[in-house]
Amino acid sequence: MNIFNNNLHETDKEINEIIKHEKLRQSSVIELIASENFVSPAVLEAQGSILTNKYAEGYSGKRFYNGCEEVDKAENLAIERVKKLFNCKYANVQPHSGSQANQAVYLTLLQPGDTILGMSLDSGGHLTHGASPNMSGKWFNAVSYGVNKKTYLIDYDEIERLAVLHKPKLLIAGFSAYPRNIDFTRFREIADKVGAYFMADIAHIAGLVATGEHQSPISYAHVVTSTTHKTLRGPRGGLVLSDDEEIGKKINSALFPGLQGGPLMHIVAAKAVAFLESLQPEYKSYIKQIISNAKALASSLQERGYDILTGGTDNHIVLVDLRKNGITGKLAANSLDNAGITCNKNAIPFDETSPFITSGIRLGTPACTTRGFKEQDFVSVGHMVADILDGLKNNKDNTKAEQQVLHKVTKLIKLFPFYD
């Protein structure tokens, strides 16, 4: 058998069908998962290229394998482009994920048992910032900060109090569900006060930072981590940035050979393509549209009587607090899914329900903005979401509302392009 003549349809009909059905699903739903986006065909092409065949342990010019001349060029391009994008001196584009980017920082700056201070999960933080089930919560003495009980905004005075009390080796800024801007200047001031390193995880807001729509942490944080998907609209992966090149050298060693073996060169190449796309003028317009769309979505839900956490949003995330409505996040997300609107259940600060149930939902605008949605479209989406939530308040069986909204979703989504 000559494998070079085989295509997916001939080789594996089952996987081929799964991909076809997933493409149909993605094309026909309103995608509101805040951490998802649609990459360009160019990114897909690079990610599915023959670079997947190449093993390239090490770094450009210092590989443990021969034959790396072309993949060296690809990695060098990715590094130079992302350094230009974020205006920084150091970048590592090899992390397989944002989690591994964070782990590389921990391996560089910490010893087991050191104290870290990060945002709690229920306040919008990420697993890798010290949550007890995660290695960051098992290997280190993890202390958590939260948000103000009245405003649901980050309480910087509380962070400072905890930092003075616990003397963390590392202070972490970043979130997976927080709709407001972060004051990186204040974080660095707190870190300096207690002699801590400061790490900014900008996985969700990387696109906003790159385009100047959010304060950049590069001048304040000792090290910055991010994913390359979400608002950067690249392949799934991670990266590490810094203006401290000495820390950068240590991070290189921590990542390889400390955490990973060979980098995924097809992913690195796809990252390079995404970074090039992000350097184009139209990308700034895209990020501005993401934010405008999120504000429109939040306002439309507020007009329908739903509580938006913090009263609005500064970024791409809208958090809906359903506690006063007697609806769980799980029930809402499942009913929306039935109606062709995909989002995720999400904990609300000081949430007393299980993380598998939750009292809220998280909505995001990057994916549908990529498809061309504008403010008026997200106003319509907000009303569709509210129709489903209204139905859940009044009926145990929400089939009627789901069918009505699904018809509207189908009509709207057909107006916007998808992959051929």
Curated annotation (Swiss-Prot):
Its EC number is 2.1.2.1. Disulfide bonds: none annotated. PROSITE patterns: SHMT. Transmembrane segments: none annotated. Keywords: Amino-acid biosynthesis, Cytoplasm, One-carbon metabolism, Pyridoxal phosphate, Transferase. It is found in: Cytoplasm. It catalyses: (6R)-5,10-methylene-5,6,7,8-tetrahydrofolate + glycine + H2O = (6S)-5,6,7,8-tetrahydrofolate + L-serine. GO terms for molecular function: glycine hydroxymethyltransferase activity; pyridoxal phosphate binding. The record marks H229 as: Plays an important role in substrate specificity. Pfam families: SHMT. The modification N6-(pyridoxal phosphate)lysine is found at K230. Its cofactor is pyridoxal 5'-phosphate. InterPro entries: PyrdxlP-dep_Trfase (IPR015424), PyrdxlP-dep_Trfase_major (IPR015421), PyrdxlP-dep_Trfase_small (IPR015422), Ser_HO-MeTrfase (IPR001085), Ser_HO-MeTrfase-like (IPR049943), Ser_HO-MeTrfase_PLP_BS (IPR019798), SHMT-like_dom (IPR039429). Its main location: cytoplasm. SUPFAM superfamilies: PLP-dependent transferases. HAMAP family: SHMT (MF_00051). Catalyzes the reversible interconversion of serine and glycine with tetrahydrofolate (THF) serving as the one-carbon carrier. This reaction serves as the major source of one-carbon groups required for the biosynthesis of purines, thymidylate, methionine, and other important biomolecules. Also exhibits THF-independent aldolase activity toward beta-hydroxyamino acids, producing glycine and aldehydes, via a retro-aldol mechanism. Belongs to the SHMT family. This is Serine hydroxymethyltransferase. It comes from Rickettsia akari (strain Hartford). The lineage of its organism: Bacteria, Pseudomonadati, Pseudomonadota, Alphaproteobacteria, Rickettsiales.
